[in-house]
């Protein structure tokens, strides 16, 4: 809540009951905390967000923060920048060494993805050439506008969020 968030939904899978017990033992830390249960089937980030759509019914942007990410980034500032830039999704990225990179044009709009280890690339854009774009590593932190849920209708219950963002990047600012 120190970063301005007072409603949280947690996707649970591994040690799900321990997470629920911990939150309940701490009186939900004085904020609204709900759970989206994936103990029977992991849905990947995209499917997890889609399953939790019911929680985001107030038409306000929301933040997704992967559990295995430690960061000292100012989350309040990330949310503020998202509101200022008018994007459907704002992805927190950095210049760091990894095998997989998101590829951005000069306006910082998402245009593709590359796996440097395997050479695999993905892009919805014709004539895509990875060397023409800036490589940034995705942090697993993102701010989304609820309008993206209607675009998820054509995606299955389980899907990778990067594939979704790439499909959106044709018509939306990502």
Describe each PLM feature range.
Residues 1-66, 77, 155:
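Conserved N-terminal catalytic core of the sugar/cofactor nucleotidyltransferase
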Residues 11, 36-38, 90-93, 113:
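Generic beta-sheet signal
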Residues 12-15, 85, 168:
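Hydrophobic/aromatic residues within well-ordered alpha-helical segments
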Residues 60-65, 70, 75-83, 96-97, ...:
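Catalytic-core segments of class I nucleotidyltransferases/pyrophosphorylases
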Residues 85-95, 100:
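A short, conserved acidic/glycine-rich loop-to-beta-strand motif
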Residues 103-105:
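Short beta-strand-to-turn element immediately C-terminal to the catalytic PLP-Schiff-base lysine
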């Amino acid at each position: 809540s120190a970063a301005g968030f007072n409603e949280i939904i947690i996707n649970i899978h591994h040690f799900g009951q321990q997470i629920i017990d911990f939150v309940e033992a701490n009186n939900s830390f004085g904020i609204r905390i709900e759970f989206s249960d994936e103990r029977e089937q992991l849905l990947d980030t995209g499917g997890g967000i889609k399953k939790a759509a019911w929680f985001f019914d107030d038409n306000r942007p929301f933040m997704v923060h992967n559990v295995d990410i430690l960061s000292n980034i100012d989350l309040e500032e990330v949310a503020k920048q998202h509101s200022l830039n008018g994007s459907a999704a704002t992805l927190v990225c950095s210049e760091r060494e990894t095998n997989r990179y998101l590829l951005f044009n000069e306006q910082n709009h998402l245009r593709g993805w590359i796996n440097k280890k395997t050479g695999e690339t993905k892009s919805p854009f014709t004539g895509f050439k990875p060397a023409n774009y800036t490589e940034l590593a995705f942090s697993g932190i993102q701010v989304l506008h609820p309008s993206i849920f209607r675009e998820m209708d054509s995606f299955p219950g389980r899907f990778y969020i990067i594939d979704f963002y790439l499909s959106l990047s044709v018509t939306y600012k990502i």
